[in-house]
A protein has these predicted regions:
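Auxiliary Fe-S-binding modules of radical SAM enzymes
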Residues: 1-89, 238-247, 252-337
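Short linear Ser/Thr-Pro motifs
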Residues: 70-72, 105-106, 187, 209
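Generic beta-strand structural signal
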Residues: 77, 89, 100-104, 112, ...
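P-loop NTP-binding catalytic core
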Residues: 86-94, 98
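Canonical Radical SAM [4Fe-4S] cluster-binding loop centered on the CxxxCxxC motif
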Residues: 95-132
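Ferredoxin-type iron-sulfur electron-transfer modules in oxidoreductases and energy-metabolism complexes
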Residues: 131, 135-143
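Conserved AdoMet/S-adenosylmethionine-binding subsite of the radical SAM
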Residues: 142-148, 153-317
């Protein structure tokens, strides 16, 4: 059976016409799949029963449910999925007073190898399809409460760019889930060639994982720095800034004694000079087997004051779901080593 979930309106239209159906059936199908929680094609009563039966001979909606749900003491929920290729991956729902955020994955595992991230330590298992990415949003019970999506789960979105771009098209299109592009943020380590492509045709907000402004130091914790210098990524963004309502931000995992002193703060200010952006400081989230430490509160506050003093708009992003392995850098999708 061929899954319709993960297909664009153009692709669904092609399928309908191939089966000698009327073109308008495609819009009815996409609306039911992406807006109405339809689990079977038989639910699409706006198209003739005879065509539904014909469609069911070779096609299915393609949605599937998580195989495990974990809830944190802070009400964060982590969902574990397994797709048809047996790739496991996770998404995290974080309710808040103003925003209810869903963090979704784009790969099972990751091949970027960032030293502070547990996801990278499990290695790369496989790319997710647009179907798998969109399904993380469609399949959870909090779907209608979500008003913000962050593509910051397992994997590097720019390493699976075609499927990620297609998934965001489905999420934001009027014929799809009609989720506002300005309420979706994609996080990347800054793979240069893909960053160029994204900046030519941006489709959501962008967050770049900075973590250290010095080339040699960044390379020691993020091996991709050697081929994808952060300075070049920043220059690309300066040359082609995002236009409102889309925005760019930077992320910085704070590691005690590694990247949180005045020297780093000054270099960050120099690097980001000329970009209207926000720097999100993320305290490193502990995982077994790592030598890194999260900064103390006085160390972190001093770093924030230093950044602000140099003109960098920076604040601390609160970690959620640490007790269930749902915080930034902790997600492994049931692939624990």
């Amino acid at each position: 059976m061929i899954c319709l979930l993960g297909k664009t309106l153009k692709e669904i239209t092609g399928i309908v016409l191939k089966l000698n159906g009327q073109g308008e059936y495609a819009l009815a199908i996409s609306h039911r799949i992406y807006k109405k929680d339809t689990s079977t094609l038989d639910d699409i009563v706006s198209i003739p029963l005879s065509f539904r039966k014909l469609l069911e001979n070779s096609y299915c909606t393609g949605g599937y449910n998580p195989i495990l749900v974990s809830e944190s003491t802070d009400k964060t929920r982590k969902y574990l999925f397994e797709n048809s290729k047996a790739y496991r991956f996770e998404s995290v729902y974080m309710p808040g007073t103003k925003r209810n955020t869903l963090c979704i994955s784009t790969q099972s595992g990751c091949r970027m190898g960032c030293g502070f991230c547990l996801t990278g330590k499990i290695g790369f298992k496989g790319n997710l399809l647009a179907q798998d990415i969109v399904n993380q949003y469609l399949s959870i019970p909090e779907r209608k409460e979500i008003n913000r999506i962050v593509i910051m789960g397992m994997g590097e979105p720019f390493d699976n760019f075609r499927e990620v771009k297609k998934a965001v098209e489905i999420l934001t299109a009027e014929w799809g889930a009609a989720f506002g592009a300005a309420n979706i943020t994609l996080s990347s380590v800054g793979l240069l060639e893909t960053l160029k492509a994204f900046l030519e045709d941006p489709f959501c907000n962008l967050a770049i994982s900075l973590n250290n402004p010095f080339r040699d130091e960044r390379n020691s914790i993020m091996p991709i720095e050697s081929a994808n210098p952060i300075a070049e990524a920043v220059n690309l963004i300066k040359a082609k800034p995002l236009k409102k309502p889309l925005r760019v931000s930077f992320e910085y995992v704070a590691l005690s004694g590694v990247n949180t002193d005045e020297r780093h703060a000054k270099a960050i200010a120099e690097l980001l000079d000329g970009i209207r952006c926000h720097l999100n400081i993320i305290c490193w989230n502990n995982h077994n087997g790592s030598t890194f430490k999260s900064p103390t509160e006085p160390e972190l506050n001093a770093f924030i004051r230093c950044l602000n003093g140099y003109g960098v708009l920076a604040s601390i992003r609160q970690s959620r779901g640490q007790d269930i392995g749902a915080a930034c850098g902790q997600m492994v999708g049931g692939n624990e080593k």
